[in-house]
Curated annotation (Swiss-Prot):
Classification of source organism: Bacteria, Bacillati, Bacillota, Bacilli, Lactobacillales
Taxonomic source organism: Streptococcus gordonii
PROSITE patterns on file: SECA, SECA_MOTOR_DEAD
Residues reported in the UniProt entry to bind Zn(2+): C823, C825, C834, H835
The protein's name: Protein translocase subunit SecA 1
Free-text disruption phenotype from the record: Essential.
C-alpha cells in the first residue's frame, strides 16, 4: 500500500514538473503579447483559426493562444492568470481534471482552454450546476471572449428552440448539465432536422465536475409523457393501509434503506384488501403500490429527502447540494406515493419516452474535462468511468486555514448545545461563522436554537435557494452567522470583510460528517481561500446518520470505556477521526460499486440507444426517397414470418401465411390459398415480396410529388420507431427489476440483463419493421394536390391501422396456429404471447 501511495505521489510530482515547464513557455510570450495593440491582439484569433485550418494542431497553438488570453484578461477584466492557473488550464485542455482549491480562480483558469478549443469551430460547452452560475460566468467571461472575437451563447431552460439553436451555434456555449442532456434527448425525438438545436458534442468543460459526474452520475434525465391511468385511488388506499401498520408489521434494513412487509404485515394486507394471497401473480400491481407507500412513509423523510412547496408540490431535495430539484420527480410511482402520504394532489403517472444518465451523456463528448477543489478521493472513478486523470494543482499562496480535530459527543442534544456555544462565542468577538448541515431539517432545528440564544443569522437551504448567492457573499462579513445546507452556495466565493483576517478569518463548523469525505472537504474549503486565515471544526455525535449506519463497534467500545454522560466533556482523538474516515471510505466504496453497476446496466441501454438514434438521424436528415430502406424492411418482415412458420404442418403453415398476407401486405381479395400451394418457402417469400412491392408502388403513386413521398415515409417510420422505443425503455426497466432476483439463483444479474435485453432489442427491431410494413401497405392514402401535414399523415395511418392492430380475422381457426408461430392478428408477437393466451 505504501508503495502504491509513493508511486502516485511521484507521478503527481512528475506531472507538475511538466506542467511548470509548459506554463513557463506561455509566460515567455508575455512581453511579446503586451507589446501588441488592442487591434493586433484581437487579430490573433483569426490568425490562430487560419493556422488551425492549415494543419497546425491545438497543441501547437497552445502557448501563444494561452498568452493571448492572459493578456486579454488583463486588459478586459483587470485579472492576470497566475502560473498555477496556466497549469490548471493546460490540464483542462488535455481532457483531465485539475484539482484547484476554493478561491484559486477556476473560472479565470477555464478561459484559456475554452478559447483554445473554440478555435477549432466545433463548439465548446462550459457546463455549470445551476442557471445562476451559467448566466454569471457567461456574462463575466463572455466579455473577454467577445473582445477576442469569439461568439458566446447562453442556453437556459426557458429559451425557445430557435434561441437554443443560436446559443449552440456559438463558439462557446454556457449551459447547465441538465439542459444539455434534455436538449440531446429532445433532438432525438424531433421529426425534422431543422428542429434540432445541438451540434455534435465536441468539448465539454464541466465546473464542479465531481458534483455532476460523481454525485449525480446515477441521476437519469427523463423525457416522459402522461399515461392514461385511474390509479390515484390505489395510491390513497395503499397509503391508508400503510399508515395503519405497527412497527412489527414491516422490516427496514437501515444500511440499504430498503423496506418490506413482515409476516404480520402480509396478513394485515390480505385482510385489508380482501385477498387470499397478496403475492399471487394477479396482485403484482397492488404489491408495487404497497411497496411504494412503505418507502414513502417510512424511508422518505420530509425536509430531508423532499419538501412540500407553497404550491402543494413535492420537490426533491438534492442530497449533495441541499437544493430543491425543480421539475424532477421520483420514478416508478414513488413520487405519487409521497404525494398521497403528504395529502397533496396526486399527479398522473408518466411514461418514459427517452432517458440518459450523466455518465453516458458526458462520455459522448470527443473531449471531456472539468474543474473542482475536491476530486482526488474519487480519482479511481474518474479514471475508470471517464478515462480522465485528476492532477492536484498547488495553491498560489500557502493554505493558512487551521483544521481542528473532530469533536465527538454522546448525543445530538449535547452536540448541538456545544455548537451553539461555539457560534455564540465567535459571534461575540466578531468572527464570521459558516455552519454546514446535511439536511433542511437540521438547518431549521439549529436556527431555532440560535434564535433562542439571541444570535442573528441567515439560513440557506432548499427552501430559499433563490437568495443563495447574496447570502453566501455576505457570509464573510464581520459578525455574520450563516447556516448552509450541505454545499449550498457552491461556486460563489466567500470574501472576508474588513478586520476579519485579524479575528482568525472565516470559521467553518460542520454539524456532522457527510458520507463522502469529498463533501466534508468542500465545506472546509469555503474557509482559507487564497492564503486567507480560517478555521474548520466538525462536531459529531453517536446519533448521527453516518455513525448509526456505518459506525464501527470499536468506536462504541472506546466510548463505553470512557463512560461519557451527556453532560461530560467531549472526546477529541486521532484514533476516532481515523475510524470515522474508515466508515466514510466504506460508504464511498459502496456508492462507487453501485454507480459502477448502474453503468454496466446503462451501457446496454446506451448501445441500443445509439443504434436507434443513429438510424433515426439518418431518416431525419435523408433528403432522398427512403424506398430502398422500406423495401428492405418489407422483405425482412416477409422472410421472418415465413421462416417462423416453416416447421409447421404444410396446411397450417399456408393458412398462417395467407392470413398474414391478407391482413398485413396486400388487399384481401388479391390473394388466395391456390397462389401459395406447391411453392417452396423461398418461392413464397419471392411471391409475397413481389406482390408487396406492387402495393407499395400503388400507395406511393397516390402522393403527388417527391416531397410528399419523403414526408410520408419519414413520419411513418419515425412514428413507429418512437412508439416501439418508448415501450422498449419500459420493458428494459421491468427487466432490470426482474433480473435482480435472479442473483438468488446464482446467476449474474448483469449478464442475464445483457443477454435478455439483446433478445428484446432484436424483437423490437422486428416489430418496428413489421409495423412499418403493415402501415405502409394498409394506410388509406387519398390522392392529394399538395403534401399533407405531419399530423394528418400520422392520424390517417393510425386511424386505419388501429382497427386492425389486435383484431383477429373472423375466419381464423386458432386451433391450427402453433404456439411459437407469429399471431395471425398481425401484432408481431408470438401466438402464445398474444391471442394464444386468451
Amino acid at each position: 500500500m505504501a508503495n502504491i501511495l509513493r508511486t502516485i505521489i511521484e507521478n503527481d510530482k512528475g506531472e507538475l514538473r511538466k506542467l511548470e515547464k509548459m506554463a513557463n513557455k506561455v509566460i515567455a510570450y508575455s512581453d511579446q503579447m503586451a507589446a501588441l495593440s488592442d487591434e493586433e491582439l484581437k487579430a490573433k484569433t483569426d490568425e490562430f483559426k487560419q493556422r488551425y485550418q492549415n494543419g497546425e494542431s491545438l497543441d501547437d497553438l497552445l502557448y501563444e493562444a494561452f498568452a493571448v488570453v492572459r493578456e486579454g484578461a488583463k486588459r478586459v477584466l483587470g485579472l492576470y492568470p497566475y502560473p498555477v492557473q496556466i497549469m490548471g488550464g493546460i490540464v483542462l485542455h488535455h481532457g483531465d481534471v485539475p484539482e484547484m482549491r476554493t478561491g484559486e480562480g477556476k473560472t479565470l483558469t477555464a478561459t484559456m482552454p475554452v478559447y483554445l478549443n473554440a478555435l477549432a469551430g466545433e463548439g465548446v460547452h462550459v457546463v455549470t450546476v445551476n442557471e445562476y452560475l451559467t448566466e454569471r460566468d457567461a456574462t463575466e467571461m463572455g466579455e473577454l471572449y467577445s473582445w477576442l472575437g469569439l461568439s458566446v451563447g447562453i442556453n437556459l431552460a426557458a429559451k425557445s428552440p430557435a434561441e437554443k439553436r443560436e446559443a449552440y451555434a456559438c463558439d462557446i456555449t454556457y449551459s447547465t448539465n441538465s439542459e444539455i442532456g434534455f436538449d440531446y434527448l429532445r433532438d432525438n425525438m424531433v421529426v425534422r432536422a431543422e428542429n434540432m438545436v445541438q451540434r455534435p458534442l465536441n468539448y465539454a468543460l464541466v465546473d464542479e465536475v465531481d458534483s455532476i459526474l460523481i454525485d449525480e452520475a446515477r441521476t437519469p434525465l427523463i423525457v416522459s409523457g402522461p399515461v392514461s391511468s385511474e390509479t390515484n385511488q390505489l395510491y390513497h388506499m395503499a397509503d391508508s393501509f400503510v399508515k395503519s401498520l405497527n412497527k412489527d408489521d414491516y422490516i427496514i434494513d437501515v444500511p440499504s434503506k430498503t423496506i418490506g412487509l413482515s409476516d404480520s404485515g402480509i396478513d394485515k394486507a390480505e385482510s385489508y384488501f380482501k385477498l387470499d394471497n397478496l403475492y399471487d401473480i394477479e396482485n403484482v400491481a397492488l404489491t408495487h403500490f404497497i411497496d411504494n407507500a412503505l418507502r414513502a412513509n417510512y424511508i422518505m423523510i420530509l425536509d430531508i429527502d423532499y419538501v412540500v412547496s407553497e404550491e402543494q408540490e413535492i420537490l426533491i431535495v438534492d442530497q449533495f447540494t441541499g437544493r430543491t430539484m425543480e421539475g424532477r420527480r421520483y420514478s416508478d410511482g414513488l413520487h405519487q406515493a409521497i404525494e398521497a402520504k403528504e395529502g397533496v394532489p396526486v399527479q398522473d403517472e408518466t411514461k418514459t419516452s427517452a432517458s440518459i444518465t450523466y455518465q453516458n451523456l458526458f462520455r459522448m463528448y470527443k473531449k471531456l474535462s472539468g474543474m473542482t477543489g475536491t476530486a482526488k478521493t474519487e480519482e479511481e472513478e474518474f479514471r475508470e468511468t471517464y478515462n480522465i486523470r485528476v492532477i492536484p494543482i498547488p495553491t498560489n499562496r500557502p493554505i493558512a486555514r487551521i483544521d481542528h480535530e473532530d469533536l465527538l459527543y454522546p448525543s445530538l442534544e449535547s452536540k448541538f448545545k456545544a455548537v451553539v456555544e461555539d457560534v455564540k462565542e465567535r459571534h461575540l468577538k466578531g468572527q464570521p461563522v459558516l455552519v454546514g448541515t446535511v439536511a433542511v431539517e437540521t438547518s431549521d432545528y439549529l436556527s431555532k436554537k440560535l434564535v433562542a440564544a439571541g444570535i442573528p443569522h441567515e439560513v440557506l437551504n432548499a427552501k430559499n435557494h433563490y437568495r443563495e448567492a447574496q447570502i453566501i457573499m455576505n457570509a464573510g462579513q464581520r459578525g455574520a452567522v450563516t447556516i448552509a445546507t450541505n454545499m449550498a452556495g457552491r461556486g460563489t466565493d466567500i470574501k472576508l470583510g474588513e478586520g476579519v483576517r485579524e479575528l482568525g478569518g472565516l470559521c467553518v463548523i460542520g454539524t456532522e460528517r457527510h458520507e463522502s469525505r469529498r463533501i466534508d472537504n468542500q465545506l472546509r474549503g469555503r474557509s482559507g481561500r487564497q492564503g486567507d486565515p480560517g478555521e474548520s471544526q466538525f462536531y459529531l455525535s453517536l446519533e448521527d446518520e453516518l455513525m448509526r449506519r456505518f459506525g464501527s463497534e470499536r468506536i462504541k467500545a472506546v466510548l463505553d470505556r470512557f463512560k461519557l454522560s451527556e453532560e461530560e466533556s467531549v472526546i477529541k482523538s486521532k484514533m476516532f477521526t481515523r475510524q470515522v474516515e474508515a466508515a466514510q471510505k466504506r460508504v464511498e466504496g459502496n456508492n462507487y460499486d453501485t454507480r459502477k453497476q448502474v453503468l454496466q446496466y446503462d451501457d446496454v441501454m446506451r448501445e441500443q440507444r445509439e443504434i436507434i438514434y443513429a438510424e433515426r438521424h439518418d431518416v431525419i436528415t435523408a433528403n432522398r426517397d427512403l424506398a430502398p430502406e422500406i423495401h428492405a424492411m418489407i422483405k425482412r418482415t416477409i422472410d421472418r414470418f415465413v421462416d417462423g412458420n416453416s416447421r409447421a404442418p404444410q396446411e397450417e403453415k399456408l393458412d398462417s401465411i395467407l392470413y398474414f398476407a391478407k391482413y398485413n401486405l396486400v388487399p384481401e381479395e388479391s390473394i388466395s390459398l391456390s397462389d401459395l400451394q406447391g411453392l417452396s418457402d423461398e418461392e413464397i417469400k419471392a411471391n409475397l415480396y413481389e406482390r408487396a412491392l406492387e402495393v407499395y408502388n400503388s400507395q406511393i403513386a397516390k402522393l403527388r410529388d417527391e416531397e410528399a413521398v419523403r414526408e410520408f415515409q419519414k413520419v411513418l417510420i419515425l412514428r413507429v420507431v418512437d412508439n416501439k422505443w418508448t415501450d422498449h425503455i419500459d420493458a428494459l426497466d421491468q427487466l432490470r427489476n426482474a433480473v435482480g432476483l435472479r442473483g438468488y439463483a446464482q446467476n449474474n444479474p448483469v449478464v442475464e440483463y445483457q443477454s435478455e435485453s439483446f433478445r428484446m432489442f432484436n424483437d423490437m427491431i422486428g416489430s418496428i419493421e413489421f409495423d412499418v410494413t403493415r402501415l405502409m401497405m394498409k394506410a388509406q392514402i387519398h390522392e392529394q394536390e399538395r403534401p399533407r401535414t405531419e399530423h394528418n399523415i400520422v392520424t390517417t395511418a393510425t386511424r386505419n391501422i388501429s382497427a386492425q392492430e389486435s383484431d383477429l380475422p373472423a375466419d381464423v381457426d386458432l386451433a391450427k396456429v402453433g404456439r411459437n408461430e407469429l399471431c395471425p392478428c398481425g401484432s408481431g408477437k408470438k401466438f402464445k404471447n398474444c391471442h394464444g393466451r386468451r
